[in-house]
């Protein structure tokens, strides 16, 4: 039996698409190999948000070809969509596919051998329909990613993703419901709604008022699903109507990854973000008032072109003031073809590093404060895996990692836990 291995970089959308492509291979008789193991086919599902992700893809390609010189190396995803010629020029690569037509990957792999090179990348801007590649199987997991949307039309000045993913395309609501019902019947308890710009769901559907809230309401009625979670979302989503609605639905997790990028209005303007810090804070306050247990996490970019010490200080003070549960800190990485890449006053690497370290320290402090508020309180935790001798790891409804000890296997269960201690990036608790 032939083996296929996947190496996945980037966002939850990529994770979903990898699972879907793996299922296509398995239907054709392939067996899954682990990422670093010997395989007949290696599929690299790329990300191109930063130079680092590009480099990781190239390193893996070369490493795996050494492991099996006769293997077929297929590269798909955002990096291959925006730079197909660059990837095809890598000696070890056989097949280059972009961010569309992934349903054909097995068919394309079967057409070639390790001596051939083929690119099927087309103009993503011409693609108008959502590509359906659903997941049907059960694989022993309890939390499923569910891709409901693709594409982005926001064109932030630093971001390459609109060029890699194309225009907004929404998945048919009936298709979403069908897949969630299937996941529920296979034992999944939590569904994470993902997309490139989830808040834009429905805007491309002609003669329809369907929005993301309609998707959530439909899933909320599906028996067997106990949790609904959203992946990264934009501030524009959180209208009074949306906040009021989700605050009354028990299945909707009180956690939102609310993209910020900068806590300075001048920087946000250069980034072409469509909100101010005042508007962002109002949304945070609105969520906290409606959902007292809510956890809000975010992304922040340091060292954006033109970011002065004064601008960074504004970001730091803003983040210190609003005390978000967790933040992912990124050092700005120029992406060819974006407006920010040619802006004046690019920030030097050492300054980016220093600013990143300062925010990471603040991140630890903010998480500790949030964790302290959870001490001696009880939370429902979805346990996903064993992480040591009699130790199991899971997530609370508000997306805080919890570790407990148990003599019994508690994987794939939702159990009540009392929080007893705050550690760096996670909490310790005891089963109630």
Model-predicted regions and their roles:
Residues 176, 193, 230, 258, ...:
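Conserved, mostly hydrophobic/aromatic
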Residues 331-345:
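Aromatic/acidic polysaccharide-binding cleft in carbohydrate-active enzymes
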């Amino acid at each position: 039996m032939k083996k296929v291995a996947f190496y996945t970089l980037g966002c939850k959308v990529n994770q979903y698409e990898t699972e879907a492509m793996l299922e296509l291979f398995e239907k054709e008789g392939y067996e899954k190999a682990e990422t670093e193991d010997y395989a007949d086919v290696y599929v690299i599902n790329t990300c191109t948000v930063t130079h680092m992700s590009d480099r990781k893809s190239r390193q893996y390609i070369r490493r795996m070809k050494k492991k099996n010189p006769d293997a077929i190396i297929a590269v798909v995803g955002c990096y291959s969509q925006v730079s197909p010629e660059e990837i095809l020029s890598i000696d070890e690569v056989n097949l280059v596919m972009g961010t569309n037509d992934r349903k054909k990957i097995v068919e394309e792999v079967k057409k070639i051998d390790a001596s051939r090179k083929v690119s099927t990348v087309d103009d993503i801007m011409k693609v108008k329909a959502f590509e359906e590649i659903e997941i049907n199987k059960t694989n022993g997991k309890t939390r499923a990613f569910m891709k409901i949307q693709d594409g982005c039309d926001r064109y932030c000045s630093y971001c390459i993703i609109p060029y890699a993913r194309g225009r907004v395309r929404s998945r048919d609501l009936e298709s979403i419901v069908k897949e969630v019902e299937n996941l529920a019947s296979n034992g999944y308890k939590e569904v994470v709604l993902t997309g490139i710009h989830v808040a834009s769901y429905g805007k491309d559907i002609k003669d329809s008022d369907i929005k993301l809230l309609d998707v959530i309401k439909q899933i909320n009625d599906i028996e067997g699903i106990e949790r609904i979670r959203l992946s990264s979302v934009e501030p524009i989503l959180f209208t009074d109507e949306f906040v009021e609605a989700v605050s009354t639905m028990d299945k909707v997790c009180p956690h939102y990854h609310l993209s910020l990028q900068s806590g300075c209005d001048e920087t946000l303007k250069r980034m072409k973000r469509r909100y101010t810090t005042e508007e962002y804070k109002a949304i945070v306050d609105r969520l906290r008032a409606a959902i007292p247990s809510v956890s809000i996490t975010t992304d922040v970019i340091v060292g954006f072109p033109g970011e002065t010490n004064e601008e960074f200080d504004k970001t730091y003070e803003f983040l210190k003031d609003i005390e978000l549960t967790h933040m992912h800190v990124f050092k700005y990485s120029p992406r060819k073809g974006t407006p920010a890449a040619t802006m004046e006053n690019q920030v030097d690497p050492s300054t980016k590093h220093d600013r990143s370290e300062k925010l990471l320290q603040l991140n630890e402090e903010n998480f500790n404060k949030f964790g302290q508020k959870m001490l001696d309180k009880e939370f429902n935790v979805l346990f996903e895996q064993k992480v040591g001798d009699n130790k199991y790891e899971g997530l609370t409804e508000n997306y805080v990692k919890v570790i407990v000890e148990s003599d019994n296997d508690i994987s794939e269960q939702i159990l009540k836990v009392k929080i007893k201690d705050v550690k760096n990036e996670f909490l310790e608790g005891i089963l109630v």
